[in-house]
Amino acid sequence: MMKMNTGTSPSVIGGGTSGNEWESRPGGMVVQRRTDQNSDVPRVFRVRVKYGSVYHEININSQSSFGELKKMLSDQVGLHHEDMKVLYKDKERDSKMFLDLCGVKDRSKLVVKEDPISQEKRLLAKRKNAAIEKASKSISDISFEVDRLAGQVSAFETVINKGGKVEEKSLVNLIEMLMNQLLRLDAIIADGDVKLMRKMQVQRVQKYVEALDLLKVKNSAKKVEVNKSVRHKPQTQTRFEQRDLLSFVEEEEEEPRNSNASSSSGTPAVVASKWEMFDSASTAKAAETVKPVPPRFKWEFFD
C-alpha cells in the first residue's frame, strides 16, 4: 500500500502565513489537514436494552440510528422492528434519529416496549399491499384471457369481411366469454394505478363486444341472403324436372301406338281424334227438367 505523504504549504491569511493546514494525499491532491485523524472513525459501544423484565446487551456503532437498533433487537425480543418503540431517558426516540446525537453512550440504558398502534398500522398496510398484489395478479390473468379471445375476434372479423359465414352460436359464445371477463373486472376493488389498469381492460373488453355485435348483424344478413337463394333454386329445378318427366311419359306412350299402326298397314298412320263438345248450359237444363218419380205402392185394406 502507498503511504500517505504529508507536507505543509504556506497559506496567506491576513497577510501572514500559517503552517500545518494543508496535506498531500497519495494521488497528489492537496487538502486541508484534519485536526484529529481519528475523529471521523465511528466508535462501537455496548448498550443495555430492557424489554419487560429481561436485559439485553447490544454492541452497536455509535453513529447508528434507533431504527437499526430495533432491527438488531427484533430477533432477541421476538417483535417486528416496526412494532416496537425505544425509550431513552423516558422519552420515545424516532427510528430516524442517531444514537450519538441523542447522547447515547457506552453502557447507556434503553427501554423497548411494544407499540400496538404501530403494529395495527403495519398489519393494515400489509393487508392493503396484499389486496393490491392480488388485484394486480387478477387483472394480469384477465388481460391474458382477453388477448386469447381477441385473436378469435380478429379471425371471425376476417372471415365475415371476406364474404364468408360464421355460425351464430360461435359468435354468441365468444360474446358470453367476454362478458364473463367484464364481470370479473367489475368485481375487482382497487385504487391508484391498479384502478387505472382495470379501467383500461374494461374499455378493451367493451370494444371487442361491440365489434362482435356488428359482426353478428353482418353474419345474419348474409345468412338471410343465402336462405333466399337456396329456397328459389330447388323450385325451378323441380318445375323443369316435372316438365321433362311429363314429356318423357307422353313420348313413351306414343311410341307403342305408332309401332302398332305401322306394322298393320305398312304405311305411316295418321291419328285423328274426334272431340265431342258438350254444352254446359244444356246439361244444366237437362238436370233441372228431370223430376223424381214418386214410388207406387199397393196398399191392402183390412176390415
Swiss-Prot record:
Region ranges (Disordered): 1-27, 249-268
Record-given protein name: BAG family molecular chaperone regulator 3
Function text: Co-chaperone that regulates diverse cellular pathways, such as programmed cell death and stress responses.
Record's GO cellular component terms: cytoplasm
Chaperone as UniProt keyword: yes
Subunit structure: Binds to the ATPase domain of HSP70/HSC70 chaperones. Interacts with HSP70-1.
Biased composition (Polar residues): 1-11, 258-267
Domain Ubiquitin-like: 45-119
This protein's encoding gene: BAG3
GO molecular function: protein-folding chaperone binding
Origin superkingdom: Eukaryota
Positions of modified residues (Phosphoserine): 263
Domain BAG: 138-216
Keywords: Chaperone, Phosphoprotein
Taxonomic lineage: Eukaryota, Viridiplantae, Streptophyta, Embryophyta, Tracheophyta
Cross-referenced InterPro entries: BAG_chaperone_regulator (IPR039773), BAG_dom_sf (IPR036533), BAG_domain (IPR003103), Ubiquitin-like_dom (IPR000626), Ubiquitin-like_domsf (IPR029071)
